[in-house]
UniProtKB/Swiss-Prot annotation:
One of its GO terms (cellular component) is plasma membrane. One of its GO terms (molecular function) is proton-transporting ATP synthase activity, rotational mechanism. The lineage of its organism: Eukaryota, Viridiplantae, Streptophyta, Embryophyta, Tracheophyta. The chain crosses the membrane at residues 38-58, 95-115, 134-154, 199-219, 220-240. Key component of the proton channel; it plays a direct role in the translocation of protons across the membrane. SUPFAM superfamilies: F1F0 ATP synthase subunit A (SSF81336). This is ATP synthase subunit a, chloroplastic. Keywords: ATP synthesis, CF(0), Chloroplast, Hydrogen ion transport, Ion transport, Membrane, Plastid, Thylakoid, Transmembrane, Transmembrane helix, Transport. Its main location: plastid. F-type ATPases have 2 components, CF(1) - the catalytic core - and CF(0) - the membrane proton channel. CF(1) has five subunits: alpha(3), beta(3), gamma(1), delta(1), epsilon(1). CF(0) has four main subunits: a, b, b' and c. It is a multi-pass membrane protein. CDD domains: ATP-synt_Fo_a_6.
Length: 247
């Protein structure tokens, strides 16, 4: 019977496919600290793309916008509308924060699908989208938490903490717990979706190298953009909620 050898070969093939280095990391040793180099390298590339694009956008503005200037003005208007819808009339000071979050996450997500990170060999692990790492998404979520605390305290002072006993003091533990669940949901939603998308593409390429992975890659680009929009929308909604003081 050839059932056992076939089963062993199948398991071996699945093991090779599952050998994607998800938990492997490349570190820089600086003093007594280990710095997660993979995330820094890819984040610097994303930041360079954003800064380069911004420099091109403002280099020579025209009264009658060109195609490139039209695109950047559309992006800015989109971010303003998003901020105004979620935050309200006091949205102005928060447009740079919401815009930075949206653009960084959007470009990071797309870089995982469009940039050939895998051709750069590292001693350990491999390069991937910055948002493919839980450290990045947690940092973004904590920045969002700090932003909505700052917004609430700036607007209401110490009276901001009165929201924890509204509409009744019985809800105090739940209201406190909510401040922990917000960054958790933001970070794990973004991390899980981007990681799953990249793993699905890697597995499909390993199984069927031609044609089949292409629709999945396009779907990944779409969902990557949606995830950036969801994160920015929720961040703006949390800031607006803290300034208004209602749930």
């Amino acid at each position: 019977m050839n059932v056992l050898p076939c089963s062993m070969n199948t398991l071996k093939g699945l093991y090779e496919i599952s050998g994607v280095e998800v938990g492997q990391h490349f570190y820089w040793q600086i003093g007594g600290f280990q710095i997660h180099a993979q995330v820094l390298i890819t984040s610097w590339v994303v930041i360079a793309i954003l800064l380069g694009s911004a420099a091109i956008a403002v280099r020579n503005p025209q009264t009658i916008p060109t195609d490139g200037q039209n695109f950047f003005e559309y992006v800015l208007e989109f971010i303003r509308d998003l901020s105004k819808t979620q935050i309200g009339e006091d949205y102005g000071p928060w447009v740079p924060f919401i815009g930075t979050m949206f653009l960084f996450i959007f470009v990071s997500n797309w870089s995982g699908a469009l940039l050939p990170w895998k051709i750069i060999q590292l001693p350990h692990g491999e390069l991937a989208a910055p948002t493919n790492d839980i450290n990045t998404t947690v940092a973004l979520a904590l920045l969002t938490s700090a932003a909505y605390f700052y917004a609430g305290l700036t607007k209401k002072g110490l009276g901001y903490f009165g929201k924890y006993i509204q509409p009744t003091p019985i809800l105090l533990p739940i209201n406190i717990l909510e401040d922990f669940t917000k960054p958790l949901s933001l970070s794990f939603r973004l991390f899980g979706n981007i990681l799953a998308d990249e793993l699905v593409v890697v597995v499909l390429v390993s199984l069927v190298p031609l044609v089949v992975p292409i629709p999945v890659m396009f779907l990944g680009l779409f969902t990557s953009g949606i995830q950036a929009l969801i994160f920015a929308t929720l961040a703006a909604a949390y800031i607006g909620e803290s300034m208004e003081g209602h749930h």
